[in-house]
From Swiss-Prot:
Function: Catalyzes the formation of 4-diphosphocytidyl-2-C-methyl-D-erythritol from CTP and 2-C-methyl-D-erythritol 4-phosphate (MEP).
Gene: ispD
Database matches in HAMAP family: IspD (MF_00108)
Xref: PANTHER family: 2-C-METHYL-D-ERYTHRITOL 4-PHOSPHATE CYTIDYLYLTRANSFERASE, CHLOROPLASTIC
Pfam family, one: IspD
Reactions listed under catalytic activity: 2-C-methyl-D-erythritol 4-phosphate + CTP + H(+) = 4-CDP-2-C-methyl-D-erythritol + diphosphate
Record keywords, A-Z: Isoprene biosynthesis, Nucleotidyltransferase, Transferase
Residues flagged as site, Positions MEP for the nucleophilic attack: R154, K207
Protein name as catalogued: 2-C-methyl-D-erythritol 4-phosphate cytidylyltransferase
Coiled-coil positions: none
Length: 226
């Protein structure tokens, strides 16, 4: 059991393709102000001062080139076809971890201070921690034909960011019990009936997914915000 003092290992799945981003390469390797999104995401983790080791998971054919791109202390391993496969590959080389962060490479502008706050919550005894922001748009649920089936109460909704943090023991249990594809690690923990703690996120920790997101991210970098 984690005692609040053990090592923190951050996993960065970076095998997603840049289809919605309009790029012909994995989106983690798209340029953002003269360097890749992946490099910026890893730098943020290291600059937080709260992470002991970073493990990056990429397509097998990019392992060697990624190692030359990142600082020597970063571990790079091959992932799988799905995000869950990549996180499992990262966990397999994180035996030393008491705590694990899972961070999207596409959230390249995440402030180091947010990363440190997630880790602080873990060290204070939380088993699962996620950063969130209030949802500003009204959300509708729809059926397969596009007909509206409901309107969730907006005050109860939150947009989830990363890094998501967990005790290593809990995240391993969640992945051992996972029987399908998941885009959210906290969701796997919830399936175990475990409580997930939310903290206030940061606007700049947005996920760079669409061409418009990339325009915004590049503008922020150019203005010197990051």
């Amino acid at each position: 059991m984690a005692d609040g003092k053990g090592p923190v290992v951050a996993l960065v799945p970076a095998a997603g393709q840049g289809v919605r981003l309009g790029e012909n390469r994995p989106k983690a390797f798209v340029d953002l102000g003269g360097t890749t999104m992946l490099t910026r995401a890893v730098d943020g983790l290291l600059q937080s001062g709260a992470v002991d080791r970073v493990v990056v998971i990429v397509p097998e054919e990019l392992v060697e080139s990624t190692r030359t791109l990142l600082p020597g202390e970063v571990t790079v391993v091959a992932g799988g076809s799905e995000r869950t496969d990549s996180v499992r590959a990262g966990l397999a080389v994180a035996d030393d971890a008491d705590y694990v962060l899972v961070h999207d490479a596409a959230r390249a502008l995440t402030p180091p201070s947010l990363i440190a706050r997630v880790v602080e919550e873990l060290r204070c005894g939380r088993n699962a921690v996620i950063p969130v922001l209030p949802v500003t748009d009204t959300i509708k649920t729809v059926d397969v034909l596009g007909a509206v089936t409901g309107t969730p109460e907006r005050s109860e909704l939150r947009a989830v960011q990363t890094p998501q943090g967990f005790t290593a023991e809990l995240l391993r249990r969640a992945y051992a019990a996972a029987d399908g594809i998941a885009t959210d690690d906290a969701g796997l923990v919830e399936r175990l009936g475990e409580r997930v703690r939310s903290i206030v996120g940061e606007p700049t920790a947005f996920k760079i997914t669409t061409p418009l997101d990339l325009v915004l991210a590049r503008a922020l970098v150019e203005e010197g915000a990051h």
